[in-house]
């Protein structure tokens, strides 16, 4: 006889009895089946970490590339700005030069018109003979002018630089040192005729200076050191003798703020050059001090000496010196010598 299969109710009863009778067995069964879930979760976490690391690496690489590109762009912008500034400065310089040349051309045109209006019968008071006479005819802009020839004296046309501003204006500049581009270690003939660039460093020429100082004349010497300090010295009754008198220097009273007067020592001395020694010393001062000047024995000043630049300016005896200010071995940065009539009225 066949047995009937056990019903669901029967199986449920068996399970309950087993649970009550042997609870430890069920716990072992439960513990045996659960570890699969944590292992699965750990594996999933590792994959996510790897993905995150890969994303971070990609972002870091992208950020690095962006930084490099930004640096390149920044350098390019800086270079463009620098180039624009340089171009702007060049344009400003060209514009300034053009304005200066335009002003000088206008001055020359006006002077030529004055020359055309002049006659041989004019008095000396009407003639144009230096920057002070130009000033009195209302030329008030500093710059280059051409003085007309003097038929009575037989002097040729002369290009001069006029200072129409300093201490009332009307000054004719006879010497300038500011760039060091022109050597002042010259011979007698060159100092007689003049040399250099009228807009830069130059010596006007002893013959011209002699002619300009035949009337009572005032001399002004302006100096600048390498620290930017400015000083001046002025002398009344400045006279430069003729060539027969070796362009001898004569000076009157000194005024100024440069300290000790370092030009008075050269008063009443003849002019000397490397090929014509007229000093009052056994030594050949022009060769020792490497300039053309009114050397005595030898100098308290040497305004036509060697131009030494910053760093070399305080080591030599043959520089552009003024002993009463910085001593015998300090070469100045800038010097100008200028003259105008004693009776000049701004």
From Swiss-Prot:
UniProt main location, coarse: secreted
Gene3D superfamilies hit by this protein: Gamma Fibrinogen, chain A, domain 1
PROSITE patterns associated with the record: FIBRINOGEN_C_2 (PS51406)
Assigned keywords, A-Z: Coiled coil, Disulfide bond, Glycoprotein, Secreted, Signal
Entry-listed glycosylation sites: 58, 253, 267
Pfam families: Fibrinogen_C
Entry's localization field: Secreted
Gene Ontology MF annotations: identical protein binding
All residue ranges annotated as the Fibrinogen C-terminal domain in the record: 122-343
One GO CC term, this protein: extracellular space
Quaternary structure and partners: Homotetramer; disulfide-linked.
Listed name of the protein: Angiopoietin-related protein 7
UniProt lineage: Eukaryota, Metazoa, Chordata, Craniata, Vertebrata
């Amino acid at each position: 006889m066949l047995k009937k299969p056990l019903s669901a109710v029967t199986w449920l009863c068996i399970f309950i009895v087993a649970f009550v009778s042997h609870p430890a067995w069920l716990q072992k069964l439960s513990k045996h089946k659960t570890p699969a879930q944590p292992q699965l979760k750990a594996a999933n976490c590792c994959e996510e970490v790897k993905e995150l690391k890969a994303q971070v690496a990609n972002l870091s690489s992208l950020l690095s590339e962006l930084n490099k590109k930004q640096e390149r762009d920044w350098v390019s912008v800086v270079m463009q700005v620098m180039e624009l500034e340089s171009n702007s400065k060049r344009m400003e310089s060209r514009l300034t030069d053009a304005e200066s040349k335009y002003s000088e051309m206008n001055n020359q045109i006006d002077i030529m018109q004055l020359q055309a209006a002049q006659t041989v019968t004019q008095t000396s008071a009407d003639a144009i003979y230096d920057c002070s006479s130009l000033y009195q005819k209302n030329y008030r802009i500093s710059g280059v002018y051409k003085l007309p020839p003097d038929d009575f004296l037989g002097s040729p046309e002369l290009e001069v630089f006029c200072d129409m501003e300093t201490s009332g204006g009307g000054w004719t500049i006879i010497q300038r040192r500011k760039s060091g581009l022109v050597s002042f270690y010259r011979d007698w003939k060159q100092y007689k005729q003049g040399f250099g660039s009228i807009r830069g460093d130059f010596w006007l020429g002893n013959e011209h200076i002699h002619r300009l100082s035949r009337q009572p004349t005032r001399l002004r010497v302006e100096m600048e050191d390498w620290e930017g300090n400015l000083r001046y010295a002025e002398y009344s009754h400045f006279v430069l003798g003729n060539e027969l008198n070796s362009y001898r220097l004569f000076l009157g009273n000194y005024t100024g703020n440069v300290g000790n007067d370092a030009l008075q020592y050269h008063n009443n001395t003849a002019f000397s050059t490397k090929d014509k020694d007229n000093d009052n010393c056994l030594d050949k001062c022009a060769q020792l001090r490497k300039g053309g000047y009114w050397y005595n024995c030898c100098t308290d000043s040497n305004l036509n000496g060697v131009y030494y630049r910053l760093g070399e300016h305080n080591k030599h005896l043959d520089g552009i010196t003024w002993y009463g200010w910085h001593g015998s071995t300090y070469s100045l940065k800038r010097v100008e010598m200028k003259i105008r009539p004693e009776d000049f009225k701004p």
